[in-house]
């Protein structure tokens, strides 16, 4: 998934001029005096596993009922699609409205800021953080090698110029194979192997030969598996939002293509937003020098800003079936808090780990 670098304009108030405003373009990154980072917004990925089935009629399909007593055999090619499964996942994308510049005091421990490739803050003083950058592409399934029925035809079958005669001979060969298989099963064949493994191998081979010759009458159906992913970045609750459409004849379609039935998604946030992991009561105590007592709260604004996401119930469904239903924390449904810079004024480095999908605090430890 290609991601574009985003630039955010941050409004900086001049310290010496109350009426003057400076606008600076920031690009995420780490410098000697601090770091610029994004917090993420949460995107919901909906992945559909689709099976495409293609039917090709057999060369002798019109004789299936006459010689094999198999009816309802189609004489026409057909392709149709079906939804095999639907999966949900979340991913963090840089939120241009949440770009921050953090600058630590000169007496603080030099922090190690870890950013993702697109500038999302992943952690502070944590050197090993794993995060997902792209959805893993589905590995295409290898198509089975199809045996040509003509490779199993007798000389008489290959020499005949009549389809009716070919159908008669092919049906006779199928019946011969079935008879041989039954004889082996009943152990009445003089040439039947005595060991069980040998019998199994011969029975499997006879079954394969029958299946290949049957394709002349019943046709062949091939299948292909593909994955289609839609990504939604919710800003508010949603009900019966159409993320795509599905057609048995055409497969997954664009939401505006009325040739398919709608696929809906419901996103409903909870009314309760989680409390901050770190509150003012749990922040480390300081003994500031005389005359600096009022500066502690101001230093909090210079700390690490993180998200407090709100959970949302996500449901993907059609008019006839519910395909997926999960609950996820969504960054943009919650609010933000600040981890005080006082944490990083200690001699010992404080380790902070954030969720790459939501920007929430996962761990704070020494």
Whereabouts are the PLM-identified features?
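Sec-dependent N-terminal signal peptides
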Residues: 4-13
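Sec/Tat signal peptide C-region and signal peptidase I cleavage site
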Residues: 15-19
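N-terminal amphipathic/basic membrane-interacting segments and domains
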Residues: 20-366
């Amino acid at each position: 998934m290609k991601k574009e670098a985003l630039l955010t304009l941050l409004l900086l108030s001049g310290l010496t001029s109350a009426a003057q405003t400076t606008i600076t373009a920031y690009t995420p990154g780490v410098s000697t005096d601090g770091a610029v980072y994004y917090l993420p917004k949460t995107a919901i990925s909906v992945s559909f596993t689709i099976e495409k089935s293609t039917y090709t009629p057999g060369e002798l399909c019109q004789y299936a009922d006459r010689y094999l007593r198999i009816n309802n055999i189609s004489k026409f090619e057909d392709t149709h699609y079906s939804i095999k499964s639907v999966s949900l996942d979340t991913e963090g994308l840089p939120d241009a409205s949440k770009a921050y510049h953090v600058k630590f005091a000169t007496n603080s421990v030099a922090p190690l800021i870890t950013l993702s490739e697109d500038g999302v803050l992943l952690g502070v003083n944590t050197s090993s953080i794993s995060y997902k950058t792209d959805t893993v592409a589905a590995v295409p399934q290898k198509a089975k090698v199809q045996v040509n029925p003509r490779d199993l035809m007798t000389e008489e079958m290959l020499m005949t110029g009549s389809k009716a005669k070919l159908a008669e001979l092919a049906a006779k060969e199928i019946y011969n194979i079935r008879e041989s298989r039954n004889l082996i099963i009943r152990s009445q064949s003089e040439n039947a192997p005595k060991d069980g493994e040998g019998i199994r191998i011969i029975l499997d081979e006879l079954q394969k030969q029958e299946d290949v010759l049957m394709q002349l009458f019943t046709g062949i159906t091939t299948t292909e598996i593909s994955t289609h992913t839609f990504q939604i970045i919710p800003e508010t609750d949603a009900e019966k939002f159409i993320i795509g459409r599905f057609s048995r004849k055409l497969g997954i379609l664009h939401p505006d293509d009325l040739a398919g039935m709608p696929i809906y998604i419901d996103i409903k946030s909870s009314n309760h937003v989680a409390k901050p992991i770190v509150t003012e009561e749990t922040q480390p105590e300081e003994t500031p020098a005389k005359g600096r007592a009022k500066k502690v709260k101001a230093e909090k604004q210079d700390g690490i800003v993180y998200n407090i996401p709100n959970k949302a119930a996500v449901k993907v469904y059609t008019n006839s079936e519910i395909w997926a239903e999960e609950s996820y924390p969504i960054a943009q449904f919650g609010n933000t808090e600040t981890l005080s810079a006082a944490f990083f004024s200690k001699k010992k480095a404080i380790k902070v780990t954030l969720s790459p999908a939501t920007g929430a605090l996962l761990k704070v430890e020494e």
